[in-house]
Amino acid sequence: MSSKETRRRFLEAAGIAGVAALAGCSGNGGGDGGDTETEGDGGTATEDGGDSGGDTSTRLSWHAGGTGGTYYPLSNEFKTIVEANTDYTLNVQSTGASVENVGSLSDGSADFALIQNDIAYFAKNGTGIETFEGNAIENLQGVATLYPETITIVTLESTGIETLSDLSGATINTGDLGSGTQVNANQILEAVGITDYNEQNAGFSQASEQLANGDIDAAFVVGGWPVGAIEDLATTNDVNIVSIEGDNRAAVKDAASWFADDTIPGGTYSGVSDPVETVAVQAMIATNSGVSAEAVENVTAAIFDNLDELTIKTDFITADSAQDGMSIELHEGAAAYFGE
């Protein structure tokens, strides 16, 4: 299927379904989708099938991402910290990430969620993605930014793809249909003048399988490095990470101001010894205006007062940088904690 036809399908479907339907979809909705194993709407069921129990006034729903990305394991570390330092219980839900999570925050089925800062901006302002055009999510509010969500273009050495220009005519997995990853991928390809490609749509783990099987030539992945699905792929295949640098990076940043410079360190993935220049968006914690100031401040304080208990993204998540790249209005509970 051509890239134009795939985008048309997405826009038509999005226009019909609207934002509300996103909360219930099972596809990957954002940069950190991975594989999803949802347990309903996230009210009381946790990813492993357990029940949170306890007082409903202290039970909070936290929507993460797919199990193959960074959002889900990081959210579970937040869960451990919050539950050890407050009276709140967090029900961490595996989801399709950013776009789906915005829908869940909008309808109140999620109290907190991890999303990309660009998707947050689109949703809050009713722009950027057809789903949000004229459907601004007015109750969406920010808590904290966390770490760069690196744009990783992964391929196998056997494809011969080494540069962005080599993607012309290729079969590319741009992420799940309607996801933040797909939005970012299409923005980047358009910005560098690549329009002739066959677009496939699937989550990170499935894209990894497609690469290994030779069904696609390259895949876009959006998430903090290292991404588990790419790590797994690199253990059994010779992978190549395509850089976004120089004039191409300048063109991408000119086309979309939320992209920032980023570098994947050499050695992050097996067989990729040199650093790879690319771009990134930001992962952030979001909530909705219906969550109390007390709950948001207490959860925020528990996390940022105990960052030494984290094992994921410890070089990036700090209280000092937690408002860098914040693209939407801050919740009053978060503002109280950060003194904004």
Annotate each predicted stretch with a short phrase.
Residues 118, 177, 224:
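Short, ordered loop/turn segments at secondary-structure junctions
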Residues 283-288:
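A short beta-strand structural signal in non-transmembrane regions
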Residues 205-206, 226-227, 269-272:
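Glycine-rich, charged/polar anion/phosphate-binding loops
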Residues 114-115, 220-222:
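Short beta-strand and adjacent tight-turn residues that come in two discontinuous sequence segments
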